[in-house]
Design a protein with these regions (language model features):
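A short, small-residue-rich loop immediately preceding and capping a beta-strand
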Residues: 145-146
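Short, positively charged patches
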Residues: 1-137, 141
């Protein structure tokens, strides 16, 4: 079985949460396949997971993860995981880095770039939208990635 299926399973089971430290998961278990096969005892003594998360990890059905992976292959989408050499190294600086990146296009755009995230309200004022547009245009013209 492709190791990416285990990463997809882990992302699906745990979901996206700020209480999950993916850096601790990878530091302790190394990869998603090792975590999958470690079992509940090891999950508990690792100190990485709370009881609710351990309960979720006990759902070891890989069917949904396999279907997601197969859909990605069918559509020529890349699945990039932390154990891939082309996983963006800058993401490892985050304590809660993504377990799977779903890529449609060229992932190289993330390498050696200044990256900026612009966060705002769903209903910005006209002035703040204008400022955000001007800032993002200036950053991208200078070679940055938003």
């Amino acid at each position: 079985m492709n190791d990416r299926v285990y990463w997809i399973w882990l992302q699906q089971v745990l979901g996206i949460s700020t209480s999950i430290r993916t850096d601790e998961i990878v530091a302790y278990f190394g990869n998603a396949k090792a975590l999958y096969h470690a079992g509940e005892y090891e999950w508990r003594i690792s100190g990485v997971f709370n009881p609710r998360q351990i309960s979720k990890l006990n759902n070891q059905d890989l069917t949904k993860a396999k279907n997601i992976f197969d859909s990605c292959v069918k559509n020529n989408w890349q699945t990039v995981t932390p154990d891939d050499e082309n996983y963006p190294s800058m993401l490892f600086r985050l304590p809660n880095f993504p377990l799977v990146l779903y890529v449609n296009g060229d992932l190289d755009c993330l390498k050696n770039k200044i990256t900026v995230a612009i966060v705002g309200t769903r209903e910005p004022t006209r002035n703040s939208a204008c400022i955000a547009r001007a800032l993002s245009a200036s950053i991208t013209r200078s070679g940055g990635l938003i």
